[in-house]
Amino acid sequence: GELLRKEEIPTRKDEGGSLILPDISEYIKGVLADMNMTTEDVAGIGMGLPGACLEDGTVNKCINLGWGVFNAANVLSELTGIPVKIGNDANMAALGEFWVGGGSEYNSMVMVTIGTGVGGGVIIDGKPLYGFNGAAGEIGHLPLVEGETESCNCGKKGCLEQVASATGIVRTANRML
């Protein structure tokens, strides 16, 4: 495909994240209108999410978005009228690197992503590894930090994400100031 436009919209996590998919749908409809296109001009939507995702489009919790278990692909497809495929954002990043980036010379690879959270994308023989309940590569919530007093977004204490994510680094720096 050809990238026609790239923008960012705010992620409204209030109301349990229930506004996120409607916001995305409205944004997509606005972009299509701006470009004099219709949903028939779009083959599909691919969306990477920060959490465990199953191949059928079900999100198995996206803690940072406030989501529980539901079929996000079906919901967004119903809102837009366009077929949707979802996946873990770290797996999607790893696939991109595997196809056209630094991993293109290998059959298998692991990619670690660091941002709001910490994730891992695992590619085995050219295919993403999903694992049990879509949790393969979900390294951000491994309990690695002893003595952490604050709870992680997942409710546990001592997760790697609490100190190694961009959010965690800022939190640690603020504590030290």
Regions found by a protein language model. Give the residues of each.
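Glycine/GP-enriched mid-protein hinge/lid loop-to-helix segment characteristic of carbohydrate kinases
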Residues: E2-E8, R12, G16-L19, S77-L79, ...
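Glycine-rich phosphate-binding loop and adjoining helix at the ATP-binding site
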Residues: R12, G16-S25, K29, A33, ...
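Short, flexible segments with low predicted structural confidence
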Residues: G48-L49, H141
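Glycine-rich His-Gly loop
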Residues: P50-G51, I114
